[in-house]
Amino acid sequence: MISFFAAIIVLIVGYLIYGKFVERVFGIDDSLKTPAIEMQDGVDYVPMNWKKIFLIQFLNIAGLGPIFGAIQGALFGPAAFLWIVFGTIFAGGVHDFLSGYLSLKNKGVSASELVGIYLGEGARKVMVVFSVVLLVLVGVVFVTGPAGLLNTLTSINTQVWVVVIFAYYILATVLPVDKVIGKIYPIFGAALILMAIGIAGGLIFKGYHIPELTLQNYYPDGAKSIFPYLFITIACGAISGFHATQSPLMARCVEHEREIRPVFYGSMVAEGIIALIWAAAAMAFY
């Protein structure tokens, strides 16, 4: 379990040191009004406490990704720990910080609009199409995945759960951000964290064996090579471009620029820890 605990510690230290470095490089000015204050409209631009925003952002970017991906990526052995840790610190955390930072600095606009601002109208149109197609695919997974899980836990048909979840998504989309998302998402986000803590506790106190990171070649015959398969199997939990579509939603609710690091970089680190726990659990059972 040494590798597992070391990975978690490195992630936390990475947030404290490298996250602070990233913040200093991009520059934070707390004297400036954020879009949540300057453009407050009671719908999308609603000031909220940063801790609540953190839980919402965490749930927005985490979901099923760091669970399913980490479980599948565990097949590559403890090398998955390295990718999750260094991917989160140097790639995913920076990506999420920057996507939230740029949106906040540009009146809370979406990822496609940001592309238009910096790369031109043609690039914006490409990004709009690209985002819509991929978000539809992600949305399908985020509907059918939970529906399938709920079907196994209840006697209610999967199709019924699909309708219920889809209706909930529509409500969360059309209502002001503080009415559904601001009230329910923090609860779900906290539940996701507690679930991971419970799994970690089970691994520790039940004495499950988690493989250690060594110089051993786990796949000497070339099967399941980590290049490139590990890096596309574990995306959420290391780095995911999907997060750029979610960060602007919360950039419109941040009250002070000093909250950018804990909300965006911090939620990515939290997702990395979730991925580590699920990867460790999968390795213990594999």
Go through each PLM region and give its residues:
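Selective recognition of specific alpha-helical transmembrane segments in multi-pass small-molecule
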Residues: 7-19, 131, 135-139, 189-206, ...
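Hydrophobic, membrane-embedded alpha-helices of multi-pass small-molecule transporters
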Residues: 48-65, 202-208, 217-281
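Membrane-interface "cap" regions at the ends of multi-pass membrane proteins
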Residues: 10-67, 256-259
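Helix-loop-helix module between adjacent transmembrane segments
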Residues: 11, 15, 91-107, 111-175, ...
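Juxtamembrane helix-boundary/capping and inter-helix hinge elements in multi-pass membrane proteins
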Residues: 73-79, 104-110, 117-122, 251-261
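Extracellular loop-to-transmembrane helix junctions
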Residues: 1-19, 73-103, 112
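Membrane-embedded alpha-helical segments of transport systems
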Residues: 59-66, 83-95, 129-140, 266-278
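Hydrophobic alpha-helical segments and their helix-loop junctions in multi-pass secondary transporters
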Residues: 139, 143, 147-161, 173, ...
